[in-house]
């Protein structure tokens, strides 16, 4: 077994080994061809809908003599009663009684429950509770009683699984998540909704509920079309939780309850585009700079994510697409410096008049649109001869990413392959520790930012800081670490751009399209506090908003793997985690569903059963697979 070098061991301990003189990250000047316009559009809200088969129900135990008690009902639709009681550090007892048959004269009798203690989430980011089950349960409303020996008011949640054939779909209509802006959620499903409500938890934990309506007056489409709408207005910045609660009857007439939990980060930031026309000026080489004059108010971020489409006109006066442009931009003297290589214009054969279309300026952590503009006139100077003469050549790195920084190119020129100048960086996930067995990899070091909650942008920058000690590196990443690596490669210059001889980015169990578990944990955490806090980048809509601006050439650099639980037989309810099984759709690894671990445009290296997301689940952790680790090690670029 290869021994890691002393330097690798030292650097695996913390971020402190990153050099103090590490240069500030330089953003790339991104661009791409018109055939990527469709992929780079902002996702339709309905495409990011939460699909929920479960219900997270708030319960409040009231004092009753020498104890506290809550009574309610749980509707069973498919012959199985499965639920989890989440009571924090409070000890509760649960009892259920089956629904009485029509005409029965005897009182309901308590039914024995299968019980097991389990963890919703991970050891670092989760909460424990008791999971109960009745595998042969009569359909109908089961009575549930929760009791505590402490005669004080207490509150918690019951998480219940429903029939997967009836799933609630809900989504935010817009991502205008700013203080004072009204936000509407829509909800619909197969079946009949009898009652729908919106339960909102503010950043301080305050709760209020309001009805949702299908009356055509709540941004819900036409009255009576089955789509319900509910609106709230956030009054402060921070993370809000919006829970849709629906009661109804399925197509077989069975009663059901469903909920969906939306993580809604709200910013106290406004940005205004000054003027309604733009101008480009010639810069070094074949570059053009397009300055976006902006004025910010509130808690403005240090930089923004920007996207826009450049259009021109052909010889017949018809509009023709030129290229998309964007990246992470830092304001300079009140302007955001967009950049375009003139060769895109020459390749398209475009001429004036030009326009910048579909402009989006977003915050860098949640991708909340702060400025949107459909079409802006754009003045472009005459193309230089050098640009015209090189227009027939293939699209190269500088056209897609801008000029490579001199320091990065110099470092690569001086480094020797497989020497101290190159490294494989092992990256953990959200709210995690170093999970990779470093001894199974050669010439490798472990990035460690233990038990932290970072946005993809923050995570990427910390990874780059750690890896700046090497002239080139590649990554093997787990969970959110895979998103951070892709984010780094997309938006910033780093040693990833110098990596050669293999796969630049590899990942296992990364929720590239989000996980429903994020919202459930956020709602539970608003009462009990859970781990590292809420991360919107791993929700369905947050992940898809992030992914919308990740270009095809960056995605193609990712080689990814997925896993799920081992299946014993067709009739057994198998799972990785007994708690998350109530929420996630099969197949899943206890944290992310296989379908949402896919990276469109990435290289899918296969799916393995019998492995779960992390330790403490039923099957071994996916990052401990020595065979796959050997394959990733052998194929990694350096």
Regions found by a protein language model. Name each.
Residues 89-95, 175-179, 188-197, 295-306:
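A short beta-turn/strand-edge loop motif at beta-sheet boundaries
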Residues 159-182, 263-284:
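Short, compositionally biased P/S/T/A/G/V-rich stretches that sit at domain boundaries
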Residues 132-134, 138-151, 155-157, 236-252, ...:
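Short, aromatic- and glycine-rich surface loops/edge beta-strands on solvent-exposed regions
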Residues 116-132, 217-232, 330-345:
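Aromatic sugar-binding surface patches on proteins
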Residues 22, 402-638:
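Lipid deacylating catalytic domains
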Residues 68-75, 112-141, 149-162:
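Beta-sandwich interaction modules
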Residues 23, 88-90, 120, 179-181, ...:
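Flexible, membrane-associating and regulatory peripheral segments of lipid-active enzymes
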Residues 53-62, 89-128:
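Surface-exposed beta-strand/loop patches in noncatalytic accessory domains
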């Amino acid at each position: 077994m290869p021994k890691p070098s002393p330097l690798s061991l030292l650097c695996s301990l913390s971020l402190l080994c990153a050099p103090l003189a590490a240069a500030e990250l330089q953003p790339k000047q991104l661009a791409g061809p018109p055939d990527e316009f469709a992929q780079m559009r902002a996702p339709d809200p309905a495409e990011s809908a939460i699909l929920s088969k479960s219900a997270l129900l708030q319960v409040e135990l009231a004092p009753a003599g020498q104890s506290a008690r809550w009574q309610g009902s749980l509707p069973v639709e498919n012959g199985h009663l499965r639920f989890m009681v989440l009571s924090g550090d409070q000890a509760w007892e649960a009892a259920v009684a089956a629904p009485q048959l029509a005409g029965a004269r005897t009182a309901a009798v308590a039914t024995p429950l299968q019980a097991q203690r389990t963890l919703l989430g991970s050891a670092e980011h989760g909460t424990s509770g008791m999971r109960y089950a009745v595998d042969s349960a009569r359909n109908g409303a089961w009575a549930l009683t929760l009791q505590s020996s402490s005669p004080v008011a207490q509150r918690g949640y019951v998480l219940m699984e429903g029939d997967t054939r009836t799933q609630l779909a809900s989504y935010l209509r817009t991502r205008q998540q700013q203080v004072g802006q009204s936000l509407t959620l829509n909800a619909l499903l197969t079946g009949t909704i009898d009652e729908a409500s919106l339960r909102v938890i503010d950043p301080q934990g305050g709760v209020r509920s309001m009805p949702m309506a299908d009356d055509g007056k709540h941004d819900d489409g036409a009255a009576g079309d089955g789509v319900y709408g509910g609106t709230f207005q956030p009054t402060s910045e921070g993370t809000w939780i919006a829970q849709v609660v629906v009661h109804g009857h399925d197509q077989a007439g069975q009663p059901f309850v469903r909920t969906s939990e939306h993580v809604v980060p709200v910013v106290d930031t406004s940005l205004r585009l000054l003027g309604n026309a733009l101008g480009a000026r010639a810069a070094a080489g074949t570059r053009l700079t397009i300055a976006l004059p902006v004025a910010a108010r509130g808690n403005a971020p240090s930089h923004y994510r920007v996207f826009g489409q450049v259009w021109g006109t052909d010889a017949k006066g018809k509009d023709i697409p030129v290229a998309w442009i964007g990246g992470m931009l830092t304001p300079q003297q009140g302007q955001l410096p967009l950049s375009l290589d003139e060769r895109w214009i020459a390749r398209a054969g475009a001429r004036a008049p030009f326009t910048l279309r579909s402009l989006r300026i977003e915050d860098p952590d949640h991708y909340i649109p702060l400025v949107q503009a459909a079409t802006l006139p754009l003045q472009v100077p005459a193309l230089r001869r050098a640009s015209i003469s090189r227009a027939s050549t293939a699209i190269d790195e500088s056209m897609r990413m801008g000029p490579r920084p001199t320091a990065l190119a110099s470092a690569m020129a001086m480094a020797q392959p497989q020497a101290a100048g190159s490294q494989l960086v092992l990256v953990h996930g959200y709210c995690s520790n170093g999970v990779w067995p470093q001894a199974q990899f050669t010439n490798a070091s472990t990035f460690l930012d233990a038990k932290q909650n970072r946005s993809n942008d923050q995570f990427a920058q910390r990874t780059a800081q750690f890896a700046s000690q090497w002239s080139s590196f590649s990554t093997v990443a787990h969970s959110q670490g895979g998103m951070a690596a892709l984010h780094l490669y997309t938006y910033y210059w780093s040693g990833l751009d110098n990596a050669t001889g293999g796969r630049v980015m590899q990942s296992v169990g990364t929720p590239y399209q989000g996980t429903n578990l994020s919202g459930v944990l956020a709602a539970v955490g608003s009462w009990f506090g859970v781990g590292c806090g809420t991360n919107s980048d791993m929700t369905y809509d947050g992940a898809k908003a992030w992914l919308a601006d990740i270009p095809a050439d960056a995605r193609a650099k990712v080689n990814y793997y997925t896993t799920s639980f081992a299946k014993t037989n067709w009739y057994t309810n198998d799972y990785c985690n007994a708690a998350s099984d109530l929420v996630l759709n099969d197949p899943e690894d206890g944290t992310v569903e296989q379908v949402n671990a896919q990276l469109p445009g990435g290289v899918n290296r296969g799916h393995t059963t019998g492995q779960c997301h992390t330790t403490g689940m039923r099957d071994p952790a996916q990052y401990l697979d020595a065979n796959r680790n050997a394959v990733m090690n052998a194929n990694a670029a350096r």
